[in-house]
Curated annotation (Swiss-Prot):
Lineage: Bacteria, Pseudomonadati, Pseudomonadota, Gammaproteobacteria, Enterobacterales
Gene3D superfamilies: YehU-like
SUPFAM superfamilies documented for this protein: YehU-like
Similarity comment: Belongs to the UPF0270 family.
Protein name: UPF0270 protein ESA_04379
Disulfide-bonded cysteines: none
InterPro entries: UPF0270, YehU-like_sf
Signal peptide: none
HAMAP family associated with the record: UPF0270 (MF_00690)
Length: 72
């Protein structure tokens, strides 16, 4: 189930995005990006609709994923 990011308290949304970014592991790109930059990127993706917050009833967890990968 998609959770509208606009309905999440700002502090909670920030923590969800940070947890997601930290779970993603090491960035092997040419230039290392800070946590703040990565969080800002994910926030922009949520705002643009490119990414969505998803609640898994099976696992009772929240995840962030590309909208194109969501199979609701």
């Amino acid at each position: 189930m998609i959770i509208p990011w606009q309905e999440i308290a700002p502090d909670t949304l920030e923590r969800l995005i940070e947890a997601f970014v930290l779970r993603e592991g090491t960035d092997y790109g040419e230039h290392e990006r800070s946590l703040e930059q990565k969080v800002a990127d994910v926030r922009r993706q949520l705002q643009s609709g490119e990414a969505v917050l998803v609640w898994s009833e099976l696992h009772e967890t929240v995840n962030i994923m590309p909208r194109s990968q969501f199979r609701g």
